[in-house]
Amino acid sequence: QLIRASIEKPVYKEKLRLRAYGTPELSDNVFVEIKKKYDGIVNKRRTSMTLQEAYDFLDDDICPDNHEGRINRQVLKKIDYFKNFYHLQPKVYLSYDRFAYFEKDDGDFRITFDKNITTRREDVRLEHGSYGKKLLPDGKYLMEVKISGAVPLWFTKIISGLNVYPVSFSKYGTEYKQYVLTNYTSLMYKGENICLNQSLHQHQRIQSALASQC
């Protein structure tokens, strides 16, 4: 329901994710996070706990111990309400290698390059590492500009000179579209409610064009 709503490009959208840096062990700290986007502005509320505590909390509603004061209880309550309201279950694993760059004089301006964007719908546990289906063709990177205010003039001149223009891209949205296109017949047979709109047809054409160029 959430991802179907997200790819319709609403003014407001939100999602819940369990996030780790690298391949974690069950005793390693991870982040449980609600990511919200309103009118292009992103807001993240997250709290830290061990991976095992995160599984216990998300799967069995067992609240983690806060004896070290590392857990934001207010955020935890919001996450608990969110997951129970939508009856959320883990559906998609997604990983990528990220290169992040910051402007020397303005830490608010950041550019990231993601490669090896990998997804799977089976065995989505984080401790099992990164393997699965590649979201983009080999050699392709996803570049993202992250800034709360105006983009610096020097950077605008560079991307304009290279004829680079912004486009909308969602890792989870793209995974969902590829999943539907690959499994459309079986999903319809099962009677699942899927989203097959103009943007999905457009996505299919773009992917076909990319494949033919490689």
Residue ranges and their predicted role:
Residues Q1-C214:
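Phosphate-end processing signature that detects enzymes handling 5′-triphosphorylated RNA
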